[in-house]
């Protein structure tokens, strides 16, 4: 028998050849988990030890889920969509991705769900320019620019007293049925003139996020925007009341992601969250089902962070990031005008001001029902045009004094002349600020209207004649003078413009006829010219 010999060099060569020729198997590996329990839009999943927070998971029927709770033995998953087909024992797989949404100009004019899928039956969305994650970071302090450009709402009561600037967060708050959504829709419609100008610096893309509303309400909003020609530059992200809590929770972040794409490309965006009370309630139900510790009013402890990280994404960014802006109009519903409740106080502290709508004013036909005393804009004043700032300087103070004097006058039997004049001026200003829905004013029309009211040109009118007088005056000035054009082009209200406006108002007053059929200015007989003629006849007769 031959002796066995082992050559170390041969062994080394054989190992090297094997390593160099080795190819791993093409068979993919995946972590697979299983549904332990499921119900109420929540699933508890075992397995998946490598799952990340906020990672997307897929169930057997293709439904997506969001990894919300990462516990030692299981994962709490928020189901995004219909959860009727998810049962115990089904497989769950990781995607390795966090939740994101497609973005681009293809979304203009469309109605989509919180995952970016179309709901309007108009086919697939074209013009997709990429994807953006929902939980994107807000711009940091050094990349923000001060708010210095106005965003006109077309509503006299807001643009004059609580102005909004591009990049601002302005809360609209009030009881149900006080006109909160109407203000937001009017603001969107008012951007039509800017859009039709074709100037990218003026154009504003609008996003309306409907959270927990009736499907019929969302359809009505869409129809109103279409009738006004505003859907051309608007995207609706819809999560109606029938949707799962997970969809209502992520809907505002979907809208923000779509808007941030435009903002970082140097464009201007207006986003409406209608309303954040519903999102907070959806987040509360998710947290309670996942057995997170409840806090005040059973909301979880991080409900403030829920809204702060959302609203901080609204900003005017520096030129280094494109110089775009995203203006936020969050809406919060109160109960019995209680602004000191948990969610209202949270959002008030996050935003740059609030427009408080009073149910008593709304029921008294004062619409928009803006409460002057509580409403405030903390940064919008810097963005107000010079013309509007000049004429509206005393408006808010006059109305606030009128409100306090009005309540005092209810108990006073006799008032001095100054108090009566103040009450008269306040009543006429209040009437002047009434405005029907879907009838926005241009900034130059607002300047003329507010100047007319604050300078006492309406004080001798009956209250029912104030709005007809205003409409007639605006038509008269538009057709007979260049005042509106001058204010629009210069954005200033000079002494010459004011003198021309004063003259035009007096001319129109001489032609205005009240609802009672009486002229506002009585024409006096020309006695001074008639007297000398009579005297000459007398002298001629004597001769």
Curated annotation (Swiss-Prot):
Name the keywords, alphabetized: ATP synthesis, ATP-binding, Cell membrane, CF(1), Hydrogen ion transport, Ion transport, Membrane, Nucleotide-binding, Translocase, Transport
Binding residues for ATP: 174-181
Q: Name one GO cellular component term.
A: plasma membrane
EC nos: 7.1.2.2
Grouped into one coarse class, the protein's main location is membrane
> Region annotation Disordered: residue ranges?
521-543
Tagged with keyword GTP-binding: no
Q: Does the keyword Translocase apply?
A: yes
| Catalytic activity field | ATP + H2O + 4 H(+)(in) = ADP + phosphate + 5 H(+)(out)
Oligomeric form and interacting partners: F-type ATPases have 2 components, CF(1) - the catalytic core - and CF(0) - the membrane proton channel. CF(1) has five subunits: alpha(3), beta(3), gamma(1), delta(1), epsilon(1). CF(0) has three main subunits: a(1), b(2) and c(9-12). The alpha and beta chains form an alternating ring which encloses part of the gamma chain. CF(1) is attached to CF(0) by a central stalk formed by the gamma and epsilon chains, while a peripheral stalk is formed by the delta and b chains.
- Its function? Produces ATP from ADP in the presence of a proton gradient across the membrane. The alpha chain is a regulatory subunit.
UniProt-recorded name of the protein: ATP synthase subunit alpha
Q: What is the lineage of its organism?
A: Bacteria, Bacillati, Actinomycetota, Actinomycetes, Bifidobacteriales
């Amino acid at each position: 028998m031959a002796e066995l010999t082992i050559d170390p060099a041969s062994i080394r060569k054989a190992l090297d050849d094997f390593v160099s020729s080795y190819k791993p198997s093409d068979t993919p590996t995946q972590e697979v988990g299983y549904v332990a329990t499921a119900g109420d839009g929540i699933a508890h999943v075992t397995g998946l030890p490598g799952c990340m927070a906020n990672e997307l998971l897929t169930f057997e029927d293709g439904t997506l889920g969001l990894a919300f709770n990462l516990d030692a033995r299981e994962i709490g998953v928020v189901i995004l969509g219909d959860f009727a087909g998810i049962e115990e024992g089904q497989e769950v797989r990781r995607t390795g991705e966090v939740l994101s949404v497609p973005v681009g100009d293809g979304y203009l004019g469309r109605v989509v769900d919180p995952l970016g899928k179309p709901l309007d039956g108009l086919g697939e969305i074209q013009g997709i320019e990429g994807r953006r994650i929902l939980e994107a970071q807000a711009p940091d302090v050094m990349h923000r620019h001060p708010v210095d450009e106005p965003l006109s709402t077309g509503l006299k009561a807001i643009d004059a007293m609580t102005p909004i600037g591009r990049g601002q967060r302005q809360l609209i708050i009030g009881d149900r049925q006080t006109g909160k959504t109407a203000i937001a829709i009017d603001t969107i419609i008012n951007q039509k003139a800017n859009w039709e100008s074709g100037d990218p610096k003026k154009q504003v893309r609008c996003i309306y996020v409907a959270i927990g509303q009736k499907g019929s309400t969302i359809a009505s909003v869409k129809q109103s925007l279409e009738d006004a020609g505003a859907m051309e530059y608007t995207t609706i992200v819809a999560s109606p009341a029938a949707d799962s809590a997970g969809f209502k929770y992520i809907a505002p972040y979907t809208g923000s992601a779509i808007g941030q794409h435009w903002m970082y490309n140097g464009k201007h965006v207006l986003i409406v969250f209608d309303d954040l009370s519903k999102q907070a309630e959806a987040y509360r139900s998710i947290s309670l089902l996942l057995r997170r510790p409840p806090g005040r009013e059973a909301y979880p402890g991080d409900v403030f962070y829920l809204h702060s990280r959302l609203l901080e994404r609204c900003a005017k960014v520096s030129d280094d990031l494109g110089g775009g802006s995203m203006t936020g109009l969050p809406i919060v519903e109160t109960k019995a005008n209680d602004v000191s409740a948990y969610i209202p106080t949270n959002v008030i502290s996050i935003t740059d001001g609030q427009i408080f709508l009073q149910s008593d004013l709304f029921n008294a036909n004062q619409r928009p029902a803006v409460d002057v005393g509580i409403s405030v804009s903390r940064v919008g004043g810097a963005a107000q045009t010079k013309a509007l700032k000049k004429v509206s300087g005393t408006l808010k103070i006059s109305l606030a004094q009128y409100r306090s004097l009005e309540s005092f006058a209810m108990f006073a039997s006799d008032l001095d002349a100054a108090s009566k004049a103040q009450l008269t001026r306040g009543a006429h200003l209040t009437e002047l600020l009434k405005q029907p829905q879907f009838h926005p004013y241009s900034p130059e029309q607002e300047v003329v209207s507010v100047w007319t009211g604050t300078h006492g040109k309406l004080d001798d009118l009956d209250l029912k004649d104030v709005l007809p007088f205003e409409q007639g005056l605006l038509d008269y000035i538009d057709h007979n003078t260049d005042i509106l054009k001058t204010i629009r082009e210069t954005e200033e209200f000079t002494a010459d413009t004011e003198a021309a406006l004063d003259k035009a108002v007096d001319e129109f007053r001489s032609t205005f006829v009240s609802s009672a059929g009486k002229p506002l200015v009585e024409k006096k007989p020309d006695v001074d010219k008639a007297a000398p003629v009579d005297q000459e006849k007398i002298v001629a007769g004597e001769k």
